Amino acid sequence: IDFPADYGLEYVVLDEGWSDPKAGDVMSVVEQIDLPELVRYADAKGVGLMLWVVGNVLDAKLEEACSYYAGLGIRGFKVDFIDRDDQKAVELVYRLARVAAAHRLVLDIHGVYKPTGQNRTYPNIVNFESVFGLEELKWSNPDMPLYDVTFPFIRMVQGPVDYTPGAYRNATREGFRIDYRNPMSQGTRAHQVAAYVVFDAPLVMLCDSPTRYMADEACTRFIASLPVVFDTTRVLAGEIGEYIVTARKRQDCWYVGGLT
């Protein structure tokens, strides 16, 4: 909480571990976490808390959970593992959005099918994963720089994308290795920074640890200063699988990012 407060970041997501995974109950908070105190502390620092939760677990007590956690001061949910795109999944997403909106909660939906405009109907859906994001490098070895200059031309046509960029342990293809507990990215740090401009993400993560971010103050301050909503977006140049250069304007300031 102190880290985002120092860098002017709006939210912290309490990821897996705040609730009892064996209980399968969104209302079951582990005894080691004092959620009301965390909310109080975060509010005092100007930071909002969001909770990660499995989609069907939230749905099982949707009204109760949204009412309780909104009353507690939680700002929203990062919903995960929908993992299907049939009618039931679509109905689930709309149901989650509708009830969350009634309680003024935002949603970042992971493990979900490609967006189809739900965020127009429910603007409280601030982002969708629906992409082979950076977390995949924890357990696999794909060519991520190639992927990064491919999916913006395809997937981003349908809506914003929560790719979770911001890795500060950067490696060449030859130096990269799979490391679940101490993960690294492929490509340069500049590549990671440029992703914050190129990838459309009204809610965007910083995926690495605060200690790594604090070790590169200038780079981290720059990322933290970037807007997440822009007035104008222009793709200046690009070729699928080769490169993309994007310029985005907020008020009177232009931001330009390029990936190869």
Go through the PLM ranges and name each one.
Residues 1-7:
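An acidic-aromatic substrate-binding cleft motif
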Residues 8-14:
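Core alpha-helical transmembrane segments of integral membrane proteins
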Residues 10, 75, 204:
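Short acidic/polar active-site loop segments enriched in Thr and Asp
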Residues 15-188:
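Aromatic- and carboxylate-enriched substrate-binding clefts and catalytic-loop regions
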Residues 30-36, 40, 228-241:
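Extended hydrophobic/aromatic segments used for targeting, binding, or gating
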Residues 107, 198, 256:
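Hydrophobic, well-ordered secondary-structure elements that form the walls
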Residues 190-236:
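Catalytic cores of secreted or luminal carbohydrate-active enzymes
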Residues 240-260:
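Carbohydrate-binding surface patches
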